[in-house]
Structure formats: structure tokens, C-alpha cells
Amino acid sequence: MFDHVPLADRMGLHPRSMETVPPDLAGLYVDYMTRVAMGTPVRVAFHVPLLGARLVGQGEYAESLLSRVTDFSPASARAACLLLDFDAASRRGPQYWRPRRMVPDDATYFNLTRMVARSRAFFDEYGPVVWDGFDFEGGYTDRITSGSGDFLTADTLWDFKVSSYRPNPMYTLQLLVYWRMGLHSVHDEYRMVRRLGFFNPRRDEVWLLDVDRIDGRLVDWTDHELIGYPKD
């Protein structure tokens, strides 16, 4: 259903198997540092791991790491990755957090930095961003009580993935849920969404779907059976 658009970066990445940070931290790094590159204050971009650090009694250490995220140098990347490890303490709960201390080596740093550069080039073509790190206030239910999205442009709801693979059914269902929750939320910005999109800076590829092409039966099932909105 999605239209596939390869982008133009000819500079290849090192193999994913060479990276010294796990995929979840790589994804968070590209997400948060792309926001920083586009003008979001570092403290705002990293507010989730900062909260997680406070929840596990590491707030002072996290602040020291944040103070070292000043640019896109290797030293800043190391500090950012250490700080991002606290993200899980906020999202999953402090009881599930275990320190990992993942530090990027040269190959990993190159990949992370290149993926941020690809993300900036992507937004030069598909942007500008009108909202990042958005929530679905008013759209949550007893079944889905939390969640936030990546980026919203004028008419497209975007999800960033740094997987080595193409979007799978779980990813597409998640994006559909985000769109439907957005329409049930208090935020008018979602009323302008006409397309759902994935951008994968590792593959440097875009996938786009007009929401008018989504089967109405799938939309109804998502609304009522998955998210839990009442039927009229």
C-alpha cells in the first residue's frame, strides 16, 4: 500500500553489526539529535531520559552528561548515548531499568552522525516540521494509556525507524493507531494529516500512504477493537 521513495545519499554506512550501541539507543539518538539539529533546545529534546535519570536517583549525573552534549562531536555523541540509556527508566518504569553504559566507537559514531545528516536532508525535502515529540492528549483509552509520535509536517504524520529492514506490519499498525488517536485527541493539528509516512535514515528511504487509501473496515477495527473507542 505504501509508495516507496529511495533518497539520494551515496555515502554508505558501516554494517549495523559493527555498531556498539543497541538499535533502540541508535534510534533515540537519531530522533533526539535530529531535533537538536533543527533547533530544539538540547534540554527539551532529552527531557524523557532526564526524567528517567531522576526516577532512578541519577539526576545529577544526567545533568553532567547533558552539559557535554554541545555539538555533534564524538565527545557529545558519547555523552548523549550515556544519557539516552535513562530513557527506558521513564518510558517503562524505573523498576525495569538496568544500566548498560553503551559508548559509540568510531564506526558507530560515523553511522549515527550520517543518519542525522540524512534526516536533516530528508526534512529539507519533506518538511518543514510543524510539531515533534507530539502526544495524543484526549485520545488515550483504557487499552492505550500512553504513547508519543516522532514528527508532524503540514500534511503527514511521520515515524522514524533505523532498522535494517523495510517497515513491517507491526510498524504500519502502530502508525495507523497514532493517526486515529490523533484524530480523537484535543489537538487540531491532526485534522490536517492526509498521509502517513516512514523515514528510515539507515536505509535512506521513504514510504508514504495517502490515508484515503486505507480500507474503512481496517479503520473501524483499529478504532473500536484495538484502541477501544466506543461505537456510535
What are these regions (language model features)?
Residues K161-D232:
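Accessory, usually C-terminal, subdomains that scaffold auxiliary metal cofactors
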Residues M1-I144:
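Metal-dependent nuclease catalytic cores that hydrolyze phosphodiester bonds in DNA/RNA
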Residues G149-S164:
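Conserved catalytic cores of phosphodiester-cleaving nucleases, focusing on short active-site segments
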Residues G133-L152, D212-D215, V219-P230:
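An acidic intrinsically disordered interaction segment
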